[in-house]
Amino acid sequence: MKALSARFASAATVLTLAALTALTAVLALTVRDGDRLGDDPVGLFWWYAASWALFAAAVAAVRRFPGRRVVWLVVAGGVAVAVTGLLGPPRTSTDSYRYAWDGRVQAAGISPYDHTPRDPALTRLRDPWLFPTGAVCRTPGLAPIARAGAASPCTRINRPGVHTVYPPVAEAYFLAVDRLSPVGARHKPLQIGAALISLGVTGALLLVLRRRDDDLRKAAYWAWCPAVPLEAVNNAHIDVLGVLFAVAGLGAVASRGPARRAVGGVLIGAAVATKLMPAVVLPGALSGVRRFRDAAAVLLPAAALVVLSYLPYVFLSRGSVFGYLGGYVEEEGYDASSAGSRYALLRLLLPDSWALPVLVLAVAGVTLYVMRSGDPRRPWSGALLVTGWSFVLLTPGYSWYALLLVALVALDGRWEWLGVALAGAAVYVLGPAFGFQQALTNLAYGSAAVLVLVMAGIRRRPAPAGKWGDPVPRLASAEPAAEERQPEELSGTVRDSEVGS
């Protein structure tokens, strides 16, 4: 029997390493191949699909990997995967150019909320990298900048005629990167910073899982996910910083004691003040809370951090510190049920005018369910439920939004929610090839929703021990099964199958 177990462990090691090696190679080729989003989005998506398939193979193989070495494998694999994002400039997003510009503007002592990149008052801050001239301005994706008395330049910054939309913690990060970057470093410091933060998320996941005596293999759902090198590292999306704060905050909230819950509230507040979207984890942070003071221990520090982070910019700015936020919401169609592909699945089933009210009611219902019945020791389970269904119903068109969802999957282990992240990638990459038709959004997010519902049904069915268990097998040191716990430990909790449905 021992010889057979050793043989299985050896085979699992070989399969895991082979899948990781292939995944790293495909991601490297995807990044090095160049910007094909406008030229060949279908071809680019095949590279994405290959990387996701290899990712699935790797996390499936690691289930049988010897537990004593799993931390080193998760970390080493995460480093290899993250490094692939550094092999080229941003390929499918220009957001990081705005980050670099906002950092430069702040370094000059100017509020990033006061001027647009097109404003002539900031001409002295322009350089040939962000504001090139000549033939390069005919490249798709570059926007013209009018300037009297000189050759008309263009800019790599998207929406150069509007004010920045990023919250204050994000802006502070942009300033820090600008201050620490050598002259002429261009996009690379933002990518390196994002890579380090993504590895920090892996470390935070491992710490939270270890504290819970949970299976450390779950961290591979984040560390090896293709969305991390492609969106967090290569495109350097600021969302990854919000993910780090959110994971650390939920880990602190899961600890007993008001002081740690307050620290968790501060960290979640920092996540919200980085990208706003992590506010969806707040219901999870309040899972099973019955007393007002317990809720206040999280909410008040979170709100205080958000308010305090805005204050310096309020005093420094002459205009609104919310920048283009309202315009962005309108542009993306979140304020109009009939615009674009937002609320696609709801609009498939209901009249357009019903979509927004139904979404609000549905998300409110999920939120109340989590707050009333969630397990306070596993706040990420409720956070995953609220975040996942919010994504399914909102059907966002940007793939990097799902970075938060991927991290919550790594904490909770319900891998089926990764289908929502893949759906976002499909909609974003294939959109140009299909004219951004709503049918693509319906197919992608509809398939993801079906997968979630099917797996929820499977998890609710009684099964013989060992046939259906956690998505990732527990280690020998894992948390004891429910029947082995003391009765008082089980009161007020939600079954895993309920939280993950």
Give, region by region, the residue ranges found by the protein language model.
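Membrane-lumen/periplasm interface segments of multi-pass, membrane-embedded glycan/lipid transferases
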Residues: 330-355
